[in-house]
From Swiss-Prot:
PROSITE patterns assigned: G_DYNAMIN_1 (PS00410), G_DYNAMIN_2 (PS51718), GED (PS51388), PH_DOMAIN (PS50003)
Domain GED: 653-744
Organism: Mus musculus
EC top class named in words: hydrolase
Domain Dynamin-type G: 28-294
An annotated Gene Ontology molecular function: GTPase activity
Name of this protein: Dynamin-3
InterPro entries the record matches: Dynamin, Dynamin_GTPase, Dynamin_GTPase_CS, Dynamin_N, Dynamin_stalk, G_DYNAMIN_dom, GED, GED_dom
Gene name, Swiss-Prot/TrEMBL: Dnm3
Organism lineage: Eukaryota, Metazoa, Chordata, Craniata, Vertebrata
Chain intervals for the UniProt region annotation (G5 motif): 235-238
Modified residues (Phosphotyrosine): 231, 593
Reaction equation(s) it catalyzes: GTP + H2O = GDP + phosphate + H(+)
């Protein structure tokens, strides 16, 4: 791929970096970059300055770079620099750039030589650079100097690893040529995070400072300690050159001259030097960006989809539009009306699967809670019979009656009908509360405008309470109507004749066949206590029995309990218990289950308890209304009189009891039918009509429109941030989409072939030229190395390591014949047992025979 295409591609990433850095998202997005890693005084700063063509990085002894420097190089006709923290300010004097880097470093890290992982973003525009993005990291050091913290080595290592462990970060490992390459900290760190060598580019500096008679040809030809992407050699300015004001241009010319004139490098001069390093880095970065963009695009699209639904309500919002408030108010009231109706009437669109809607809860009130409250109020048999007995006796007075008085029937019936007011009014209260809860949920969409939300909720809630009063009046009127006239000619009323015939019979509940009424999970709490813990079972309620199974597959039945003579009662919630409990018991004092008189069943909520009670009621299991233990004297007298009733009075009581039961069943059916209809008409439908027709007018009349449509500061900020993020994501995806599809990437180089190491051990003595370069070499690998075969063990084949690939021919010694290459023992078999040659310390004048590039066959870098 040509330089033109590279120049088009890499600025896209710079634009992405700027777009998200401004939003504080740079730390979340791993964009392709090149991290420069090396020891202190390895020449990292000089390499970067050669790219820019200017002196702009701080220099000094010890640790100078204490924060990562994100350096973006941009080709431009003008030459200047910009910092992200000083956006808009152009630095044309690069001495000021150096001072700003030092000042910004001190602002975060202080003056105690500490470090920080917060990057400094610097963009340099120049006609002398190619488009590159690099990160200059602090130099690797091991011993703290001066007032550096004791753990400075680990701090620097952690910070470097924070950058180079990213899969989309290329590593520029800088190593001086006059040090031991096998012990390069930069290469070791790169090898640790990039064992395949796909992300590592080696840079050899200070080639001009090597001792006389030595060179780095084998390293630069990628023969010694090879890297998959190879090495590039550079020659930087010395401190003497810098002090002598030698400019970058002159240094580049001197570098070019050095490679062309050096006998060991002239044949590879076109692949050496800072200009070639720039091109290599550009090519590698471009390839890496192209490989990363598909995953990056998917990540951006995922973020875009996650906020798109919220942004949909924001993106058409235009504060500068004078009519926006009227339009927004109208749309929000309409949406509120639609949401309210959907929650009440139900809708197949966007069904909530987590909780019941307002309409579903009102349905449960109508058909489960209200009937249950009626039955719970109605069935108190002993008290009812006592009241009938008193009514008969009081009507007869001093006389002895021969016939059953119908006035006693009317008195008892009217009293029972009046008792229906309690459950009826309670159902109105429950429905009102559900309507208000529904309104609160619907106004959440208006949360962008707190005043509008508050006013809407207030107006609708006030109307609901107003309708509640009128609905209660109508409910009381309906019950009073029933009390006003007792219609004994009703077609379903049994009449006196039938009541007398049934007076001697025991009243039995009517069954509805053996159909399944309800299924669900319940916890048997009292049995579980005896056996070490409560257990959950799958219960099936029919019209005749209550069965429970091990699970909802209903294969293993645990027990079947007949419903005859069963009643249900409430059980107080236990201490520290989150369960709601009710109990079943037998009215004839028999055991319900094995040795247990009560069967206590637990639910997760009171709603579930009420629902199960209503289902049991449908099956004929009525609630028990226990009579208090503290009885008054009148109760005791009345109870005594009940025991002393004569047979005639007993027959009259039973007759009226049957008449009351028959007539109240008619009234109950009527009330259970009319009360929900009354609530629906006077309350629910009226509230819906009010919201559709009058809410908007009342909002306009209640407050000024501008006041209603004022956004909260938090919402305005959130909306702006959401829209800005949305636009940034759209722009980022558009930038990625702009990449020329015709561009192609250079494929990654194959794994390096280290089979030449095997051959070199078996080769005849090298030529004098080669001998000069290999005067002193490092020892061969120890025979006990755990990461490679021992030297004494012959290799199974010439290609036992990485797959063999063609490599650049160099002045390698001639290979022995093939019969020798497998059978001959390694050259110098006693070499592994010898201590490595000592490296004398640098002191003037340097020893002409001192090795500069030590070439150990380090298994940690070769495997």
């Amino acid at each position: 791929m040509g330089n033109r295409e590279m120049e088009e591609l890499i600025p896209l990433v710079n634009r992405l970096q700027d777009a998200f850095s401004a939003l504080g998202q740079s730390c979340l997005l791993e964009l392709p970059q090149i991290a420069v890693v090396g020891g202190q005084s390895a020449g990292k700063s000089s390499v970067l300055e050669n790219f820019v063509g200017r002196d702009f990085l701080p220099r000094g002894s010890g640790i100078v770079t204490r924060r990562p420097l994100v350096l973006q190089l941009v080709t431009s006709k003008a030459e200047y620099a910009e910092f992200l923290h000083c956006k808009g300010k152009k630095f044309t004097d690069f001495d000021e750039v150096r001072h700003e880097i030092e000042a910004e470093t001190d602002r975060v890290t202080g003056m105690n030589k500490g470090i920080s992982s917060i990057p400094i973003n610097l963009r340099v525009y120049s006609p002398h650079v190619l488009n590159l993005t690099l990160i200059d990291l602090p130099g690797i050091t091991k011993v703290p100097v001066g007032d550096q913290p004791p753990d400075i080595e680990y701090q620097i290592r952690d910070m470097i690893m924070q950058f180079i462990t990213r899969e989309n970060c290329l590593i520029l490992a800088v190593t001086p040529a006059n040090t031991d390459l096998a012990n390069s900290d930069a290469l070791k760190l790169a090898k640790e995070v990039d064992p395949q060598g796909l992300r590592t580019i080696g840079v050899i500096t200070k080639l001009d400072l090597m001792d006389e008679g030595t060179d780095a040809r084998d390293v630069l030809e990628n023969k010694l300690l090879p890297l998959r992407r190879g090495y590039v050699g550079v020659v930087n300015r010395s401190q003497k050159d810098i002090d002598g004001k030698k400019d970058i241009k002159a240094a580049m010319l001197a570098e070019r001259k050095f490679f062309l004139s050096h006998p060991a490098y002239r044949h590879i001069a076109d692949r050496m030097g800072t200009p070639h390093l720039q091109k290599v880095l550009n090519q590698q970065l471009t390839n890496h960006i192209r490989d990363t963009l598909p995953n990056f695009r998917n990540k951006l699209q995922g973020q875009l989809l996650s906020i798109e639904h919220e942004v949909e309500a924001f993106k058409n919002f235009k504060p500068e539009d004078p009519t926006r408030k009227t339009k927004a108010l109208l749309q929000m009231v309409q949406q509120f009306a639609v949401d309210f109706e959907k929650r009440i009437e139900g809708s197949g669109d966007q069904v909530d699967t987590l909780e019941l809607s307002g309409g579903a809860k009102i349905n449960r009130i109508f058909h489960e809670r209200f009937p249950f409250e009626i039955v719970k109020m109605e069935f108190n048999e002993k008290e009812l019979r006592r009241e009938i007995s008193y009514a008969i006796k009081n009507i007869h007075g001093i006389r002895t009656g021969l016939f059953t008085p119908d006035m006693a029937f009317e008195a008892i019936v009217k009293k029972q009908i009046v008792k229906l007011k309690g459950p009826s009014l309670k159902s109105v209260d429950l429905v009102m509360q559900e309507l208000i809860n529904t309104v609160k949920k619907c106004t959440k969409r208006l949360a962008n405008f707190p005043r509008l939300c508050e006013e809407t909720e207030r107006i609708v809630a006030n109307h609901i309470r107003e309708r509640e009063g009128k609905t209660k009046d109508q409910v009381l009127l309906l019950i009073d109507i029933q009390v006003s006239y007792i219609n004994t000619n009703h077609e379903d009323f049994i009449g006196f004749a039938n009541a007398q015939q049934r007076s001697s019979q025991v009243h039995k509940k009517s069954t509805i066949g053996n159909q399944v009424i309800r299924k669900g999970w319940l916890t048997v709490s009292n049995i579980g206590i005896m056996k070490g813990g409560s257990k959950g079972y799958w219960f099936v309620l029919t019209a005749e029995s209550l069965s429970w199974y091990k699970d909802d597959e209903e294969k293993e039945k645990k027990y079947m309990l007949p419903l005859d003579n069963l009643k249900v009662r409430d059980v107080e919630k236990g201490f520290m218990s989150s369960k709601h409990v009710f109990a079943l018991f037998n009215t004839e004092q028999r055991n319900v289950y094995k040795d247990y008189r009560f069967l206590e069943l637990a639910c997760d909520s009171q709603e579930d308890v009420d629902s199960w009670k209503a289902s049991l009621l449908r099956a004929g299991v009525y609630p028990d209304k226990s009579v208090g233990s503290n009885k008054t004297e009148n109760d005791e007298n009345g109870q005594a009189e009940n025991f002393s009733m004569d047979p005639q009075l007993e027959r009259q009581v039973e007759t009226i009891r049957n008449l009351v039961d028959s007539y109240m069943s008619i009234i109950n059916k009527c009330i259970r039918d009319l009360i929900p209809k009354t609530i629906m008409h006077l309350m629910i439908n009226n509230v819906k009509d009010f919201i559709n027709s009058e809410l908007l007018a009342q909002l306009y009349s209640s407050e000024d429109q501008n006041t209603l449509m004022e956004e909260s500061a938090e919402q305005a900020q959130r909306r702006d941030e959401m829209l800005r993020m949305y636009q940034a994501l759209k722009e980022a995806l558009a930038i990625i989409g702009d990449i020329n599809t015709a561009t192609v990437s250079t494929p990654a180089p194959p794994p390096v072939d280290d089979s030449w190491l095997q051959h070199s051990r078996r080769s005849p003595p090298p030529s004098p030229t080669t001998q000069r370069r290999l005067t002193i070499s490092a020892p061969l690998p120890r025979p006990t190395s755990g990461r490679g075969p021992a030297p004494a063990i012959p290799s199974p084949g010439p290609h036992s390591g990485a797959p063999p690939v063609p490599f650049r021919p160099g002045p390698l010694p001639p290979f022995p014949n093939s019969s020798d290459s497998f059978g001959a023992p390694p050259q110098v078999p006693s070499r592994p047992t010898r201590a490595p040659p000592s490296v004398p310390s640098r002191r003037p004048p340097p020893s002409p025979t001192r090795p500069t590039i030590i070439r150990p066959l380090e298994s940690s870098l070769l495997d």
